[in-house]
């Protein structure tokens, strides 16, 4: 943050287990500009603000803890490691572990795991409970939560959202996603944020009909295939760069309980040039309608598009824990760079 070294307590504003005015009218009003956007060196996308349920399975199983701190049972395995094989047999979920261990006659097994893109083998002792055998590790193979889709890119035919990584709530590690899906809500509920507690979005989602899927999970969000009709109700908007961002008035987009996309006024109060941070844009909610509705920025709003001077410039990522009216966002350029994984 320019000229300041302030230590603040922050919360990533997406939930993992792990609204008033409609769009402002200053959009690109037709597709003619989109046809010429390459020649004009401009990029156009559909800003969304669509709240979605998120479910994903991990690549292998994630180690989130130990039954006991005993080197015999954990070896060199660390929290946040991804187990991908036992005795050279590939595993994809927790059930695979149980099935493999049923056929093991030895007291030890070889665990193959990945850590920081490296493949590592560790031999550990099994725990025995009568005839049952199991690892002395706590593991997870799936996550679920709520987040917001930032935009749909018609050139790349992908969505991008959340603005920060989906992380494991126990290890705080970025999750390696094998397959993820997004779902539209059947019902949305709000737990309002206060200075004493962070609010959050929750609800029921239509899990029978995913509106998109993804495999890419990066420090700057997720990206994948998008099947929702939501983009048809919006218009193309120019993507702004860091140099287009100014201090002062802007607004964010977010769905309300009736699935209408609504704009809410904010102020941009500071801008950082740290390219590795997800706290590049400091924002403050000034719209009484949003403050009365949610208390300000709450979990599940991560990914809400930030718009200024008719350009999509960023996405909301964090809330300040003891002041829900204030938070942070990321430059939209960081999300544009995300590549989809087939």
Specify the residue positions occupied by each region the protein language model found.
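A short glycine-leucine-enriched loop at secondary-structure breakpoints
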Residues: 71-82, 103-105, 296-300, 305
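PDZ domains, with a preference for the canonical peptide-binding region formed by the helix
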Residues: 85-118, 323-334
């Amino acid at each position: 943050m320019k000229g300041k070294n302030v230590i603040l307590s922050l919360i990533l504003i997406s939930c993992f287990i792990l609204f008033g005015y409609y769009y402002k009218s200053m959009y690109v009003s037709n597709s003619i500009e989109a046809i010429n956007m390459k020649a004009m060196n401009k990029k156009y996308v559909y800003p969304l603000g669509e709240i979605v349920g998120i479910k994903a399975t991990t690549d292998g199983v994630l180690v989130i803890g130990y039954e006991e701190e005993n080197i015999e049972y954990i070896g060199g395995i660390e929290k946040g490691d991804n187990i991908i094989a036992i005795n050279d047999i590939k595993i994809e979920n927790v059930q695979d572990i149980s099935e493999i261990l049923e056929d093991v006659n030895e007291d030890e097994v070889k665990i193959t795991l990945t850590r920081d893109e490296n493949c590592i083998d560790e031999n550990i002792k099994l725990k025995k409970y009568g005839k049952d055998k199991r690892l002395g590790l706590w593991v997870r193979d799936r996550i679920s939560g709520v987040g917001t889709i930032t935009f749909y890119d018609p050139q790349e035919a992908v969505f991008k959202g959340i603005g920060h990584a989906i992380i494991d709530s126990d290890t705080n590690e970025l999750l390696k996603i094998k397959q993820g899906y997004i779902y539209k809500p059947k019902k949305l509920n709000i737990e309002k944020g206060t200075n004493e507690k962070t609010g959050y979005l929750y609800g029921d989602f239509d899990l029978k009909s995913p509106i998109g899927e993804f495999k890419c999970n990066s420090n700057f969000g997720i990206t994948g295939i998008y099947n929702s009709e939501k983009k048809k109700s919006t218009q193309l908007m120019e993507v702004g760069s860091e140099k287009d961002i100014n201090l002062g008035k802007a607004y964010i987009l977010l769905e309300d309980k009736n699935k209408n996309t609504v704009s809410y006024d904010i102020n941009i109060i500071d801008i950082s040039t740290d390219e590795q941070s997800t706290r590049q844009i400091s924002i403050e909610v000034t719209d009484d309608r949003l403050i009365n509705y949610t208390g300000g920025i709450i979990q599940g709003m991560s990914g809400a598009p930030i718009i200024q001077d008719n350009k999509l410039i960023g996405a909301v990522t964090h809330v300040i824990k003891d002041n829900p009216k204030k938070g942070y966002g990321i430059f939209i350029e960081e999300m544009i760079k995300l590549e989809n994984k087939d």
